[in-house]
Every structure is written in structure tokens, then in C-alpha cells.
């Protein structure tokens, strides 16, 4: 190219170059001279064309260079390029003949430094959180005892071995492993595809559908774990119809996948411990529950049986209940029969003293026979009559007890009488008497009012209770 320039300066008859030819010569010179380069700069003017290609500029404080990334490369990016991000770009320097400018064809982009990654991470987290992907009400409970567990991780390394070993120790389960890359280019696509692939398995098919998913990888730097901060992975976890445990990195590592998962485990081993219980402990717990349930059922029955037996022992027998009533019935029947005999005897005496016609005797005899038949053929009538008489007698006894003047004496009161046996009701009457008799429940006591000389005691005759007499009342009078 330098020879062509020298010839043109000599003014000879060299044939002039076309614009396109010169542009091609410049293009080859730039590409041959520089080849692949790595640039560090800030993204600016990021645009995606309808074709899928991405156009942008890389700049620093003093210069700007245009860049282009073709559709296939753009789809494999590990993050979403945005204006203001500081990146390290790898590509091939070339020219664009159509506009007489040079540019870099980008073949890879990576975040420049941890600070830029953290800034992008926080910005993405806020945006996805605003969409509700991390809401607590989206979290689903994990199955208590999953029969099949799907694991999304690298098929090699310590992570899968730790998970399988821990599951076997605690509660052996059927495990399906979907092998994926866990860092670098294409890792995010494989992880999200594996999560969606497990969710697409039909229940009841040849391949068992997992009841629980574990998305896991070991620890590393923020760049190593970046695939699990990618939006496609976060959305795959949030959309998964199967509950997901995220176990990415160590306990101090946090990714956006942890926010979207139904449960976060600090380590892959801890994820296995969360997924299944210890079989031996579960069996012991079940045995304890069974024993407690059996005791809870049998103890009330035993206590009820003991209380029932105690109450049965305290219950009186039928004979004990009926004996007093039968005795009372016998007594009343005998009294009734005696009264009937007395009445019949009195009737016979009256008939003997009177002159009766045969018709009257016959009628009286028929009436007596009828009553006798009633007594003989209807013992229930006798029992009812005896019951009524007993109730009447009990009522009269209560009235008699109420009217008995000695009843107050039994309660601690006393009767004061003068020498003639009359009741003294006032203090003034008592002071006029030379001697008084005080009657108690168990006897009488003679007293002298204060200031009076003692007089000869006079025996006070007790008066019978009102309403009573020396003769017994006739029950049938």
C-alpha cells in the first residue's frame, strides 16, 4: 500500500484506485495488523435491531469506538448489556466501508470488576422484585416426603456426590439428575432449560415426575455464580410448577435464584437435609405418636370403666329399694283389714240391736259382698287407698308437729308459768309472782324472781298439745 502512495506522488501514469478498492485495502490492513483485541470501556448507545444484532459504543474519557455483536453471540451473553456498564469486550477490529469508519465486532462481553456486577445485580433484583417474583405469598410448602427428587447441577464434582450421599444416609429416594454447566457461557441457558424440562414431565409417565427440585452448585466468586443471577434462571424457578430448593454457593453467597426459590439452603448438603427427614427418626416419631394415640384412646376407656364399676357398686339392689315399700304396704293392708273387721263387727252389733227387714238385710249383704269382692279382686284399689291414707296421715303428722307447743322447746326456747300453771308472757307479770316455773325440753325448773322470798314450789301439770286428747283418733271416723 505504501508503494501505491509513493507512485501517486511521482505523478506518473499509474491508474487511480476506486473508493471501494481503497476501503477494502484499509479493511485488510486493519484486520491483519490488529486481529483480536480486548478493550475495557463503558457501554453507550446500546440498541438491539429487529434482526437481533446489537449495536453499541465503547468509550472512555478520551475516545469512542463503535461496536457490533451479531445475533448468535448476543443470545449467549451472560448478562443484559445496558448503558453505563463498564465491560471488557473481546472482538476483532475491522472497518465498515459503507461509512468509512472502523469498529469492533464483539465476540464476548464480561463485566469489568465486582463493583459493576454488584450494581447490575442490585438493579436486576429491584426490577424483578417489583414484578412480585420474590413475594412471600408465592412461596410453596415443600413436600414432607418426596418420592422423586430432581437435581439440577454439574454431573461431576463434589456437589452431586454430597447430595446423593446425604440423601442415602437420611431417607433413600429416587433421584433424577439433569446435568448442566454451572458457570460460564451457556450455563444460564442450560440451568433454566433443565428447570423447565423437569416441570414439563407428565405425571404417571415412564419417567417419574419429581416432587421436589434442588438447583445446586458449589461456592465461588460472584463471576462464577453469575449464571444463577441471570433473569432467565430466576424466571424459570419462579414459573416452576414443582417446589424448588436453591443451594448455590456457600452460606455467605446469595444469588437471585435464592430469592425466587421456595426455600434457600446454605449449602448443597443442607439442601438434601431439608429435602427429606431422617428415616430412623421418622420411624421413632411415628412409633411415639402411635403409642401416645393408643394411650389417649385406652386411658379414657379405663377411667370410664372404673367410674362405672364404682357407681354400680354404690347403686342399691332392687330388693333393697322395694323392701321398705313392701313393708309399708303390708302394714297398711293389715291396718285396712283390721279397720274393715272392726267396721263389720260394729255393723253386726248395730244390726243385732235393731229390727231390720229381710230386704234391708239382703241389700246390706249384697253391698258387703260387693265390697268384699272389690277388696279381694282389686288389690290395686287397696294399695291406692293405703297410699292415700298414708299421705293423709303424713300431712296430719306435719300439721301436728307444727302446732305442738313443745316444738320450740326442742329448738332452745323455754315456757315460763306462774304458781297456778298459767303462762307468763311479759316481764311485768313475772315480777309480780313469788315463784315461777321455767319449762325446758327435758324438764322444769322452779325459780324465784329477784327480790322475792322463796315460796313453796307447786307442781305444774303439763298440758297436752293442742288438738290432742287422751283417746286415739279413729282413722275411719
Curated annotation (Swiss-Prot):
Catalytic activity: Exonucleolytic cleavage in either 5'- to 3'- or 3'- to 5'-direction to yield nucleoside 5'-phosphates
Intracellular or extracellular location(s): Cytoplasm
Keyword tags: Cytoplasm, Exonuclease, Hydrolase, Nuclease
Broad EC category: hydrolase
Name used for this protein in its record: Exodeoxyribonuclease 7 large subunit
Nuclease is among the record's keywords: yes
GO terms, biological process: DNA catabolic process
Subunit and partners: Heterooligomer composed of large and small subunits.
Physiological role: Bidirectionally degrades single-stranded DNA into large acid-insoluble oligonucleotides, which are then degraded further into small acid-soluble oligonucleotides.
EC number of this enzyme: 3.1.11.6
CDD domains named among the record's database cross-references: ExoVII_LU_OBF (cd04489)
Family: Belongs to the XseA family.
Entry GO CC: cytoplasm; exodeoxyribonuclease VII complex
Gene Ontology terms for molecular function: exodeoxyribonuclease VII activity; nucleic acid binding
Gene responsible for this protein: xseA
Domain of life: Bacteria
Region (Disordered): 452-477
Pfam families: Exonuc_VII_L, tRNA_anti_2
Matching PANTHER family: EXODEOXYRIBONUCLEASE 7 LARGE SUBUNIT (PTHR30008:SF0)
Cross-referenced HAMAP family: Exonuc_7_L
